[in-house]
Every structure is written in C-alpha cells, then in structure tokens.
C-alpha cells in the first residue's frame, strides 16, 4: 500500500470514534437484554466494529446500505440516530419504524439505511436494485450490501455479483466473516480460504 493510499489522521479518528460508539452500544444491548429490560433477538457484532466504521466514513449521507439481521452496528455506523433506534428496539412508536420493525428490520432512509433484512443473503440483490435505480437516475449514489460468510454460500451471492458486474452497478459487497455460519465453522462450509476469491 502506497503512502497516498493511507487514510489521513482525521479519517482514522472518525473510524475510531464510530468503532467506539458501536462497541459501547453493543455492550449496552447485551447488558439490557441480560437484565431483562428488553426482550428481543440480538446478534452481537462484538469484534467487528471496524468494518462498518471504515466503510461508512467513505460513504456520503445519501448513499445506501442494505444490511442483515446482525446489522444494528452497520446502521449506527451509517448514522441512524440512537434515540429512535433504541425506541425501535423497545417497540415504541417513536422508533425508526414506529416500533414495528424491531431489531431485525431497522430502516432509516434519512441515513441511507434502506432495509435490514432477516433473510440470509437477501441484502445483495436488494442493494443491486438500489444501485441500478441510482445508475438509471444518474444521481451518483452508491449502495453497500453487508452480508456474512454463510450468505456467500447461497445462490443470491453469485447472482448478485454477476448482475453487478454485468450492469457495472455502483454497489459494494462487504462480507463480515466472523468464522461461523450459525454453528458451522467457516472451513466446514466454504471451499475457499478467501471469499473474495469468488468475486
């Protein structure tokens, strides 16, 4: 990596600030769930704070992200305000989806968070659709599809990458590989050492 490819100090500090916010919120989520204050499905992103932090500092406010049920940290990094996010998780009408989406379906278009989906692998074709719409409008927006390593083993992954390549879509695919697809270790479910090799 050349010197000019290195992020500047201000960018690094913003990544660190976002990662710290994600870590603090993850700790709070786990604390309130353990205490029984909130009863909800929650998939911790502990140890993955840098990924959405580094991605989000390189996006514009109106760029899109489509994330998965494990993506609360992606939404926070993109800029979803904490008060309506927490209200959503608590099922309150002041939430981002009026309390009807819950933790697995956070949406906040003002921050560019178009959908959080509970269906494994579905973030990729949805992000492609948003990217294609942006391309047709010529508005310069970029879409990001977050997904896990398990989703890289389903058809939607291959179809989405093929479509993005074919149409030269302004879309970025971000695999957050935590080493497990539910309970299956990465090496038992994927035949390549690096998911990026499939692209």
Residue map of PLM features:
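A short, conserved beta-to-alpha structural element at the edge of catalytic cores
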Residues: 167-187
């Amino acid at each position: 990596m050349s010197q000019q490819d290195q992020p500047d100090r201000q960018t690094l500090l913003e990544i660190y600030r976002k990662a710290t916010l994600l870590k603090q919120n993850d700790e709070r989520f786990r604390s309130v769930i353990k205490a029984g204050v909130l009863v909800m499905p929650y998939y911790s992103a502990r140890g993955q704070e840098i990924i959405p932090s580094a991605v989000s500092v390189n996006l514009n406010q109106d760029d899109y992200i489509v994330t998965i049920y494990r993506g609360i940290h992606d939404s926070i990094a993109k800029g979803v305000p904490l008060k309506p996010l927490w209200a959503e998780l608590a099922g309150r009408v002041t939430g981002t989806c009026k309390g009807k989406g819950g933790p697995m379906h956070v949406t906040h278009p003002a921050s560019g968070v178009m959908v959080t989906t509970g269906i494994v692998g579905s973030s990729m074709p949805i992000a492609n659709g948003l990217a294609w719409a942006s391309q047709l409008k010529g508005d310069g927006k970029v879409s990001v599809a977050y997904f896990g390593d398990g989703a890289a083993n389903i058809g939607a992954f291959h179809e989405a990458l093929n479509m993005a390549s074919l149409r030269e879509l302004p879309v970025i695919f971000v695999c957050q590989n935590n080493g497990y697809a539910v309970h299956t270790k990465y090496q038992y479910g994927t035949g390549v050492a690096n998911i990026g090799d499939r692209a």
